[in-house]
């Protein structure tokens, strides 16, 4: 991808997702007119954040760096309190903005801080992980974790823009790229089967941050999410399809105290959801098996502890999709045909889990 590509997210108001390389000038353009900007970044991105700060300063913007903890450990209320304190100290006003720089967790917590500071200030997401690019940065869902579960405290707050700089992929560890692929695979199964065809044609090319396949996979995954979000911004119905595989995934993450990568948990969750659909008579055997084959080809896990189901069931009952104690899952009625399964029999859940159980 030699020229930047823009995907428009048609919410109200709409915003651009700009995909390309060397997007510092685009960031300055998006932030034009702001007097102050707070750059929220993870510790490993201090140097990058300083480059951004200096670039914005050259454009006459008073930019400040705020370092936040890495990964899910940063998605906690004390971290948000610290951010609020610094925003107050630097005097960030309603016509100013926040920039999030980092992975999915940084995007989530920065978005929540932006949604709550002065009842909402603009935020521009600059995701630096594959997961952040195709999932957390697009759609306006923000959140933090509590003892009650993952992302149960949050707000809908659409960004002013998202800048996906593909050059950052080249410095990512391979396992970060592998983990992010789970969300791309999800997009393929729920809406864009071409994604699956591209991965199956050459899984290693799909994982190559210097090649041409991964940028196109990112673009397609962003388009899927943008279209769903535009149709259902506040997750009243259609947007729930983006949670395909996530009910079990969030339960696994909670059981693992958020030490598992989100993408790894989603991978297991996708296979579980496929088996649940198959055993419920809604998904054909070949498509269910295709889940497992594609995920394995990318190096993602497809099994989890055999004895964990009771704990996972308890965690799933706390999922935000649950209604009056009734579990609700997103399943497929065919390739690209997501639907809902409500209140499945415990024996069906146990049978589906047996397909991902690791002894």
From Swiss-Prot:
GO terms for cellular component: cytoplasm. SUPFAM superfamilies: Dehydroquinate synthase-like (SSF56796). NAD(+) binds at residues 70-75, 104-108, 128-129, 141, 150. The lineage of its organism: Bacteria, Bacillati, Actinomycetota, Actinomycetes, Mycobacteriales. This is 3-dehydroquinate synthase. Keywords: Amino-acid biosynthesis, Aromatic amino acid biosynthesis, Cobalt, Cytoplasm, Lyase, Metal-binding, NAD, Nucleotide-binding, Zinc. It is an enzyme of class 4 (lyase). Pfam families: DHQ_synthase (PF01761), DHQS_C (PF24621). The keyword Amino-acid biosynthesis applies. Its cofactor is Co(2+); Zn(2+); NAD(+). CDD domains: DHQS. Its EC number is 4.2.3.4. The keyword Membrane does not apply. The gene is aroB. Pathway: Metabolic intermediate biosynthesis; chorismate biosynthesis; chorismate from D-erythrose 4-phosphate and phosphoenolpyruvate: step 2/7. Binds 1 divalent metal cation per subunit. Can use either Co(2+) or Zn(2+). It comes from the Bacteria. Catalyzes the conversion of 3-deoxy-D-arabino-heptulosonate 7-phosphate (DAHP) to dehydroquinate (DHQ). GO terms for biological process: amino acid biosynthetic process; aromatic amino acid family biosynthetic process; chorismate biosynthetic process. Zn(2+) binds at residues 183, 246, 262. Belongs to the sugar phosphate cyclases superfamily. Dehydroquinate synthase family. It catalyses: 7-phospho-2-dehydro-3-deoxy-D-arabino-heptonate = 3-dehydroquinate + phosphate. GO terms for molecular function: 3-dehydroquinate synthase activity; metal ion binding; nucleotide binding. It is found in: Cytoplasm.
